[in-house]
Amino acid sequence: MNILSKKDIYLDNAACTMVDLNIVKKINKIEKKLFANASGIHKMGLYSLNVLNESRISVARNLNAHKDEIFFAGSGTESVAIAILGTVYNFHEKNPNSKILPHIITSNIEHSAVIENCRLLEKRKQAEITYIACDENGIVNPKDIKKALKENTILVSIMYANNEIGTIQPIQEIAKEIRHFKRFAQDKKFDFEKSSGQVTRHFQNQIFYPVLHTDACQAMNYLFTENIEKLGVDMLSFNSSKIYGGNGVGCLYKKRSVEISPVCGGGGQENNLRSGTENVAGILGLSLALEITNKIKDKESARLIKIRDYAIEELLLLSVSSGYEIILNGSKENRLPNNINISVFGISSELLVIELDAKGIMVSERSACASNGEGSSHVIRALRSAQNKTFDETSGALRITLGRQTIKKDIDTLVKNLSQILEKYKNFN
């Protein structure tokens, strides 16, 4: 049953996308046959295993990767956790007598899946974390990553595109800085036992720490991911719910040469990296969604950029007509084609979300993964800090994220209704 009416406008695609109807049809045709555990050796188990293997091959092909570099998980968050925790656990297994902690570099605007796992490692005294501050446009400077690299740095995890403000991070430039650091380390032949304690580093096949991980959940629909090697990352996380493939499935690309350990025990599925019965129907949905995404990516991005820029222009014009100060959060140029994030000063963003919802327009105030927790957006806080501005607790931000179903008329309806809401509350301030 579709609970959306024809008049409803869904503009929360950064939180979750609608499932592509073509994918629904394809899965419905065979879903009744996919009930069996893919680990079973009977014919129904083998049928599920075949679909699982074909899905893995399809994902690998669409990333220009090897099939044994693709691992399925239950969500994007789990994929991120496997990458981060698995890297640290593997380090401790290989260096049980180390006198120093492994070092991780990330940013202060990462998704909570990255930040909370890093905090967990800090709390357990299993890793040392450096949080790189973004600039006033919400961009992480690769030179800041370079400055933070140390002899005990084992992992750099920087998102490809921000889930709240949509800013695109210079992943290829960051990868370049890490490669330069590795070459320097190899040329100098660092003696970690003397310089840093009891850490032993192995330079096998020129692949060694630090490894580069990126959270690409928001990027897959729009940015370059078709050739992992050219992107320059060692690990990449994404999920199905952001690419019109349905909920409950995540994926981790891990380069063959990168060693990580499982974060939990079990039946040893996914080459012992993620135990648990695979959601084969969901994994099939993810593989089909990625294939569709890669085919229409350029055309759809160009279409949405026009709508996005129109929306930004019209929303900022409300500053004049409404009397409220309205600003765009994050870079206008280096942002996702579907992302608009504004702050309306003097009125609660939560109130605006509720009022717009009452009018059939669905937006959000921040990441859906953070909305259940207390406190304001750490991303907007980081942005205000970089801008040397005071964070306005009462205003927050309004995240408007477009999708394949979005048309220009939807923006006109949004702007009209938002204008009416602002007029309604003007006299309350």
Predicted regions and their residues:
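Pyridoxal 5′-phosphate
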Residues: M1-N429
